[in-house]
Amino acid sequence: MSILDYDYIKTLITTNNGEEVSYRWSHGASDMHLGDGLIIYTLINFFKFKVLVCLGSGGGFIPRIMTQARHDLSVEGFYEEVSMEWGDNGSTYLVDAVNGFNGEVDWEDKESLLRRHFHPKFIKDTTENAYYNFFVKQDIKIDLLHIDADHTFEGVKKDFDLYSKIMNKGGIITIHDTDKNYVNNFVEIDGHEGDDLTGPSEFIKTIDKRKFEVMNFFNHGIRKDKPSSTGLTIIRKK
């Protein structure tokens, strides 16, 4: 017996009823392994985070883990309402312009498994417009922010600089694709021009460690015969 429900994981978290969730490999995940998604789940569960925001998601891997973590906290007795949607156990916000920049999404349809089962609040806009015209206007403060949208240095910096202003005290920011060693050793198919992933790894070097705690979770190369994460960096204001 495992502490994890592998049947559930391989049906609804790492696959869409058997079809592999897009880009899950970038999290080091496989059918029965959550990769760095387990770190996101643990942060939400341990700190009882309620307001969760994901900036960019090709396959919806992280948003579904966010919602599952909120749901499980309710089951564990921390909130009265047991729901995948939103209520006293918080909300999951997913921001994506669905413009093909840094990957294609496969969950835009309201009947997609992600939206039908995990019910993220979907904001179809750029991260900058969403910041000023949704989060700021509604005075929403964030417990956990996952940055995985524009992967240029300027894009990552802008998302961090903006959204770090509306984090709750003790809130955590996670940035995906930060392992420079992974990026530098990634092989593309001949003739296919991949997305530029250098921005996240370059940006984290510039974070002021006098103001922020920074912890990197890199596992590239530990098991060369298995998928590994492209890197996850956790940031928290001191």
Pin down the residues of each PLM region.
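Class I SAM-dependent methyltransferase Rossmann-like catalytic core
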Residues: 6-47
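Short amphipathic alpha-helical segments that mediate assembly, nucleic-acid/protein binding
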Residues: 5-6, 200
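S-adenosylmethionine/decaboxylated-SAM
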Residues: 31, 41-238
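N-terminal auxiliary segments of SAM/dcSAM-dependent transferases
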Residues: 1-2
